[in-house]
Amino acid sequence: MREKYRQERDKRSVGRTYQFARGDFSRYARDPYTERQEREPLTDEVDVAVVGAGIGGLLTGAHLRKETGLERIRLIDGAGDVGGTWYWNRFPGVRCDVESYIYMPLLEETGTIPREKYSTGPEIFAHLQQIAHRYDLYRDALFQTTVTELRWDEAAGRWLVSTDRGDLIRARYVAMSIGLMHRPKLPGLPGLETFAGHSFHTSRWDFDYTGGDSTGGLTKLKDKKVGVIGTGSTTIQLAPHLAEWAEQLILFQRTPAAVDVRGNRPTPPEWAAGLAPGWQQRRMENFHALTSGVPQDEDLVQDRWTQTTAKLAAAILPTGDTGGDPKERALAAERADFLKMEELRARIDSVVTDPATAAALKPYYRVYCKRPCFHDGYLQTFNRPNVTLVDTQGQGVERLTPAGVVANGREYPLDCLIFATGYEHEFAVPYTERAGYDIVGRDGLRLSEKWADGARTLHGLQVNGFPNCFILSKVQAGRHVNIAYMLGEQTRHLAHIVKCVEERGHQVVEASEAGEKEWVEEILRLATNDIDFLENCTPGLYNNEGDPSGLPLLNSSYGGGSVEFVNILRRWREAGDLAGLELR
């Protein structure tokens, strides 16, 4: 089986390029949901400018409201509303793949109980809007507004925030939460600009063309041949709805997804009624620990995330002993991984009726080479007579023509082509390039210059030379499948630092040179932990398209695990000495 995995990896190691949705392709990034509203430029001052109004930006605003006396907190976002990922992603079938009771933040604070174990995109979006109302974050927000530069004014102790609307906003603090899924990317295919049919990216869904909404009902596709490039987590949710309405659906696959059972169900009213105060944080931490391989007395979430991790952990450490021969432990992990993937491959055989299609859908790689997918209707889609799987044997689509898509030497005529090809990757694309602006700190130092060879931070949050500036990302910080939980921990930490600055009468805080150096050394010490594993995976997002060593080690997440990262932040706050920071 190792040889089979190697073969599947190697036949995909042909390199894959992407085209960013900019310049001639900028139409793929335009907002189809909110009509642009013109306004006069603003020149004013705020306490905090938060760039990004997704979960990270909202939690920054919420925790600052709760922990500090700062009054004017301004969210700035290019979208037409709050929500981030959940504003942009409205495609039919969109849901979270992490349990909604632990993914949707501040449930207790807002008095919200999700309707299902795995909530729909519209429900999540509405909840994020509720958070913005609850913490009065709409009041000073600027939407449909893109930051063009952040520049520190040393004499005034303020950040100058410039935007594409001509605004000049002075802010004591800036926090950047530009997110993971806001800049769509396209496949770098010959002929991309020549396709004469209709096309769009899944994060800019064109309901005017398809009809329907996020729940389905795509009535305008009844006479359309629709193609989708990409078979990751978006297509897993989307395909059943397209198949229901399109005359013909053609899915172009480079690498099969590993699709496990979702097991969604309505929220039991009696369970919700019996929840004790603090239930959400306890549930989050329980899930966080279990999915990080840290044993717990019980599994509160009981889903495929926790159950799979438990199986792998039990195989490696059957008695809970953390010692033993590392080679034997690695072999045990590989065996358990193989058995889990065999389970998923067997599920395909049990559902998909055509043997050739079933064989093409089988994934041959380790469980966590890619983000696992969960769905109870995707595989069944391939039993429909109007659905065709075009397996490209790892080579990907060859090119586009005015009429359609060429794959495996054959042209597939299409009326509509949908790109489910993901987003600019935060580990591979320089931060300021993804952000779309540069950050100019003390003495004219540009973040693009300081980070030319990779990031340098304290705890992934603050940078020497950039006072009163906070960056939320996974770079040099904790990384976990529940992104919302990690953002919650980071924003609590951010608010704690600002509160300390305010209470102690200081004006400026930044990472010290020594503090930053010490953290960077720790990042580098642990940064190679995943490379051997990722090198044996099929090319994809996690391993830089098959070249994990091509990513700057400085752009790694904290390699000691997300549980330890959260503990590091908590111990730091408890110590109270603000180690690694300079305050003036």
UniProtKB/Swiss-Prot annotation:
Tell me which EC number(s) this protein carries: 1.14.13.170
What the entry lists under SUPFAM superfamilies is as follows: FAD/NAD(P)-binding domain
Which GO molecular-function terms appear in the entry?
1-deoxy-11-oxopentalenate oxygenase activity; oxidoreductase activity, acting on paired donors, with incorporation or reduction of molecular oxygen, NAD(P)H as one donor, and incorporation of one atom of oxygen
User: Looking at its record, which EC class is this enzyme?
Assistant: oxidoreductase
The record's comment on cofactor binding reads: Binds 1 FAD per subunit.
Query: InterPro entries, alphabetically?
Result: FAD-binding_Monooxygenases (IPR050775), FAD/NAD-bd_sf (IPR036188), Neo-PentlctneDsynPtlE (IPR054972)
Concerning Pfam families, the annotation shows:
NAD_binding_8 (PF13450)
Record keyword Membrane present: no
UniProt pathway annotation = Antibiotic biosynthesis; pentalenolactone biosynthesis
Q: Does the keyword Flavoprotein apply?
A: yes
Going by the UniProt record, its keywords in alphabetical order are: Antibiotic biosynthesis, FAD, Flavoprotein, Monooxygenase, NADP, Oxidoreductase
A GO term (biological process) for this protein? antibiotic biosynthetic process
Highest taxon of source:
Bacteria
Q: Which cofactor does it need?
A: FAD
Q: Give the binding site residues for FAD.
A: I55, G56, D77, G78, T85, W86, D97, V98, Y103, V147, M486
Reactions catalysed according to its record: 1-deoxy-11-oxopentalenate + NADPH + O2 + H(+) = pentalenolactone D + NADP(+) + H2O
Q: Which residues does the annotation list for site: Transition state stabilizer?
A: R371
Role according to the record: Catalyzes the flavin-dependent Baeyer-Villiger oxidation of 1-deoxy-11-oxopentalenic acid to pentalenolactone D in the biosynthesis of pentalenolactone antibiotic.
Member of which family? Belongs to the FAD-binding monooxygenase family.
Q: What is this protein called?
A: Pentalenolactone D synthase
Source species of the chain: Streptomyces exfoliatus (Streptomyces hydrogenans)
